[in-house]
From Swiss-Prot:
Role noted for this protein: Antiterminator that binds to cis-acting regulatory sequences on the mRNA in the presence of histidine, thereby suppressing transcription termination and activating the hut operon for histidine utilization.
Listed name of the protein: Hut operon positive regulatory protein
Biological processes per GO annotation: L-histidine metabolic process
Name of the gene this protein is made from: hutP
Pfam families: HutP
Quaternary context: Homohexamer.
Matching InterPro entries: Regulatory_HutP, Regulatory_HutP_sf
Family: Belongs to the HutP family.
Lineage, highest ranks first: Bacteria, Bacillati, Bacillota, Bacilli, Bacillales
NCBIfam families linked to this entry: PRK03065.1
Coiled-coil intervals, chain numbering: none
Keywords associated with the record: Activator, Histidine metabolism, RNA-binding, Transcription, Transcription regulation
């Protein structure tokens, strides 16, 4: 049940989100793990969530026909957005926009098989007034 030292899923997601396109992450992805990265910018939080969900589905990080996987990913994305927006996910209503790089990682960070697979979402970028 202990977290494996080389299998820190949140850290892996952050490294992937921080890496440029031409960089590879410092750590290699553990065998059997899935991930995707991308960029999203919008004044609409629904578009941010939709772009990240679409990336995860098109890169086979989650299965498109399994509701539980989509639901788990949605909650992980919302938690990450809460962090970036400091608890207020409103963007357009308060004239804020985001430009973000994201990483979504799915894997088994724990030794025990009973713990199952986990998903981590990391966001990195800017939040501020829209540029006109």
């Amino acid at each position: 049940m202990l977290l494996q030292g080389t299998h820190r899923i949140g850290r892996m997601a952050m490294l992937l989100a921080l890496a440029d396109e031409n960089e590879s992450p410092v750590l290699s992805i553990p065998k059997g793990w899935k991930y995707c990265t991308g960029k999203v910018g919008s004044m609409n939080s629904q578009k941010v969530v939709a772009a990240m969900e679409t990336a995860a589905k098109s890169n086979q990080v989650i299965e498109t026909d399994v509701y539980r996987e989509t639901h788990a990913l949605y909650h992980a994305i919302m938690e990450a957005l809460y962090g970036v927006t400091r608890g207020q996910i409103q963007l357009a209503d308060v004239l804020r926009t985001v430009g973000l790089r994201f990483a979504i990682v799915r894997g088994t960070p724990y030794d025990g098989k009973k713990e199952g697979e986990w998903v981590a979402v990391a966001l990195y970028g800017t939040i501020g007034a829209p540029v006109k």
